[in-house]
Structure formats: structure tokens, C-alpha cells
A protein has these predicted regions:
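Beta-propeller domains
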Residues: 1-476
């Protein structure tokens, strides 16, 4: 496994602006746009170490494509978390699984004035004409997509804000509207769906009460429905108020609750129904659509929430550790009533799934899912291959290279394409053998390498990003 953990989960990546990266192979002549990515820029502050892959200080990465060339820039998000860490040499704010060392007095004060991290490092999106770095806290940070300079905190409407949100908003391009889910913690907590439109007030569309809120990293959306999958990893909100331990360590796995699907009518905001299933866990929904009188929900599922603990850095540094396998499941919810049931679409290990969202979100004709995976011959360590799964046939295509650890595969469709998979896959790959990273460009149909652009340094393991054609970098 060489020095993969230190390279992928280590110290700060230097901030750089590079006009031209060395390119091997041939870039598509139609690829004119920008890949923006978000993730941790360091897992250490001074002598202190963050504890979990979902911790760290946010860094943005930008790969821009021109004729036969790729440029690169990266920059830390200039948040309070980052600025105070730089000034003091210490971790300043509580993160997903890391709590700053505090005196007893400091812990008592944190109960009355908890310092929520603004290190928005998980994903990014273009919402209401702004580019936002997204976190699971309600503090989302606007940035300039050209310079990567931090603009400031994006303010939601007071009626929308909760204490937790997903980093995977859904988009309805036909109506220029985005949707997201927030959780408000209280004596009776609520899940709330809201919409965001440029030039308009944000609107709460629906809410569901709950006494023990679940950890939900994403939610589903079909043509006519929102889907909240309430995994039985739940919290007593009082424990969060006391702030005695890091955020995720307040949650408990309660499999006796099962995993209900809450389905909401997109057009009326009314609850359609609750559809029970056996307990399982997931970070990522993939797609959802109506098929006859059934609602189909595809997601990457685990039998329990042990994957959360598997991402603690001390476990990821263990050369013999193996990640729990996430698998692509298709759940069918009978809208007339009854329990949800599922079928397995592939035996392949999967995480960080992507598909052609632009054309096939909520579309029953969608077929291909791309994801990071673990090679069956090299199961120890971290995600070390990419897979393409055909949801109709179960066929799996792979990309794997020794000592290489790819990140989220972003699909970019060829302009004017007819076939769903006519395009390329972009993935930032850590090359542990060389001690650097490179941007991999795969042909999405054959899954063969077309090109790679090599960086002079390793990029820490991040999470999510997106590709923006040249013109949409200008806000709508």
C-alpha cells in the first residue's frame, strides 16, 4: 500500500496556479470547461490531527480545459475555521468527528455558544446565481469560480435554516429551481424540503416531524416525488445541545427501527406515504423515477452504518483494514401501499456514485452509473479502482492501476450526443507510487484511458465536484 495514507490523509497541499499541466494522451477537442472540486486541504493543524475523513479544512481545486491543454489552481476556503487555525496553530471548531481540546470551562461555554464549523468542504453547486461550497452544516460559503477567492457566507431565509442539511441538492433546470433537505433539531425535530430560485425568496415546501432525527447525507427526487430515506442512525437532539462529543458520535445505530422511505408529492408538498424496509444505511442516492404504480429508488446501500467508523483516519492508516462494501440497490416502493423491496443491480463495491444527471435525472431510461470501487485482488486500503455499471445487464467495466487511488468519477457528455455514455469520465487520482496526483480522462463508453494531466504534488482525498461548461461559469 506504500505511503498512500500519508499522501491522501496528510498535511496541507500547497496553493498553486499552473497555466499548463503536462498531458499524456489526447484530450477531446470538445472539452472546454472547468472541473471544480472540493475537499480537505489538510488533516493537520500545527501538532493537532483531525480524526476522520469527513473532517479537515476546505480546499477548492480547479481544472480548466482548452485546446490540448489543462490548467490548474487550488486555494483554501478562507473561512473562520481556516483563519483561526492559521492564526493559532490549533483546530478551532468542532468538525464531523473531531472536537477541539477545551478546558472544562470551555466545554461548558460551548453548550451555550457552540462553535459550528464553517469549513464547507464536502461538495459544491451553483445556486441562485452563486457558486457555493457546501457543508452538512447550514453554513454554505460563496466563492468566485474564476479566482477561487472566498466571497462570504450564503444567507438562507430564516424559515428555511435548520442545524443540518444535505450536500446534494437536486435541480429542476426547466424551472430554474434547486431543492434541498434541512433538519431542524428541537424537542420535536423536523425534516424540511425547500426550494431555491434566483431572485426569489426561498420557499419551504414540506416538513415531517420526528423525535429522533436520522443522519441523511442525501435524498431522492423523482419527476413527481421527494424521497427521504430515514436510516436508523439517529440522535437524541438533547445530546447535540450539550455538545459533549463530536457531532457524529452522538448518533446511534437502532436497526429495530428499520429504514422507512418517506415520500412527498413534489407539486403539493403533501405526504404520500411511508414505505417500510429492513434496516440499511447509505450516504448517496443515485436516481429515482416512477415506473407504473411504483416509485423506483436507486442508491448505494450498506447493511449497517459501520462505513462511518471505517473512515476514521486511524483505521484508514491501518494497512490491513478493509472498507465495508457499498452495493447498488434498486428499491421499489408500491405507491398503492405496502413494504419496499429491493434488487441488487451489481455485486461490485461502489461509493461516490455519479451518472448523467443533466439528461437522465428522474428518467426511467437511465442506464449507467459510475463510481469508485475496491479491486477484489487488493481489498486492503482505500478505493483503488473506478467502475461503470450497466443497470440493465449488470455488466461492470473497470479502470485500475497499481498504487493508484481514484476519486469521484464525474461524467461529462459530448455535445450533441445520442448515446447516454457518449462522453468522458474525469477523476482526480492519487498515484502513491510517484507521490503525485493526476487528472484522469476516460472514454465513458469503452472505459479506456484517453489522457492524463499530471500535478507536481499529491491531492488529498476529497469527496465531490462538478464540471461546468465554459459559459455557465458566469452566474445566471
Amino acid at each position: 500500500m506504500s505511503n498512500m495514507p500519508e499522501l491522501g490523509f496528510g498535511q496541507a497541499t500547497p496553493e498553486l496556479v499552473l497555466d499548463r499541466l503536462p498531458v499524456q494522451g489526447s484530450l477531446p477537442d470538445w472539452l472546454h470547461g472547468t472541473l471544480l472540486r472540493n475537499g480537505p486541504g489538510t488533516f493537520r493543524v500545527g501538532q493537532q490531527q483531525y480524526r476522520h475523513w469527513f473532517d479537515g479544512l476546505a480546499m477548492l481545486h480547479k481544472f480548466s480545459f482548452g485546446p490540448g491543454r489543462v490548467s490548474y489552481a487550488n486555494k483554501f476556503l478562507a473561512t473562520k475555521s481556516y483563519q483561526e487555525a492559521q492564526a493559532t496553530g490549533r483546530i478551532a471548531y468542532s468538525e464531523f468527528a473531531t472536537d477541539p481540546c477545551r478546558s472544562l470551562f470551555g466545554r461548558v461555554m460551548a453548550v451555550f455558544s457552540p462553535q459550528i464549523t464553517d469549513s464547507a468542504k464536502v461538495s459544491l453547486a451553483r445556486l441562485a446565481g452563486q457558486f457555493l461550497a457546501l457543508a452538512e452544516t447550514p453554513i454554505q460559503v460563496a466563492f468566485d469560480p474564476e479566482t477561487l477567492e472566498t466571497v462570504g457566507v450564503f444567507n438562507y431565509e430564516p424559515g428555511v435554516v435548520g442545524q443540518m442539511t444535505t450536500v446534494h441538492p437536486h435541480f429542476d433546470e426547466a424551472h430554474d429551481t434547486a431543492y434541498n433537505l434541512v433538519t431542524r433539531y428541537h424537542r420535536i425535530s423536523h425534516y424540511r424540503i425547500y426550494s431555491v430560485r434566483p431572485g426569489r425568496d426561498n420557499q419551504r415546501l414540506a416538513q415531517i416531524p420526528t423525535k429522533q432525527p436520522a443522519y441523511m447525507h442525501s435524498f431522492g427526487m423523482s419527476q413527481n416525488h421527494f424521497i427521504l430515506t430515514e436510516f436508523p442512525l439517529v440522535v437524541n437532539p438533547l445530546n447535540l445541545l450539550l455538545w459533549l462529543r463530536p457531532y457524529i458520535e452522538n448518533f446511534r445505530w437502532q436497526p429495530q427501527r428499520g429504514t422507512p422511505f418517506w415520500v412527498i408529492n413534489r407539486h403539493t408538498g403533501q405526504l404520500v406515504g411511508r414505505f417500510d424496509s429492513d434496516p440499511f444505511f447509505a450516504f448517496h442516492h443515485v436516481n429515482a423515477f416512477e415506473e407504473g404504480n411504483e416509485l423506483v429508488v436507486d442508491l448505494v446501500a450498506y447493511p449497517d452504518a459501520s462505513i462511518v467508523n471505517a473512515y476514521y483516519l486511524n483505521r484508514l492508516h491501518d494497512p490491513q483494514a478493509e472498507l465495508p462494501f457499498g452495493q447498488l440497490r434498486r428499491y421499489r416502493l408500491p405507491l398503492g401501499g405496502g413494504r419496499a423491496r429491493y434488487e441488487l443491480l451489481s455485486e461490485a463495491c461502489m461509493e461516490l456514485p455519479r451518472f448523467d444527471y443533466e439528461r437522465y435525472n428522474t428518467n426511467s431510461q437511465y442506464r449507467y452509473v459510475y463510481a469508485v470501487s475496491v479491486n477484489p485482488q487488493q481489498r486492503q486500503g482505500f478505493y483503488n479502482q473506478l467502475v461503470k455499471v450497466d443497470t440493465r445487464t449488470g455488466r461492470v467495466q473497470t479502470w485500475h492501476e497499481t498504487d493508484c487511488y481514484p476519486g469521484e468519477p464525474v461524467f461529462v457528455g459530448r455535445p450533441g450526443r445520442v448515446a447516454e455514455d457518449d462522453g468522458v469520465i474525469l477523476s482526480v487520482v492519487l498515484d502513491a507510487g510517484q507521490g503525485t496526483s493526476f487528472l484522469l480522462v476516460l472514454d465513458a463508453q469503452s472505459f479506456a484511458e484517453r489522457a492524463r494531466a499530471t500535478l507536481p504534488h499529491p491531492v488529498l482525498f476529497g469527496y465531490h465536484g462538478d464540471y461546468f461548461p465554459a459559459e455557465p461559469l458566469l452566474p445566471r
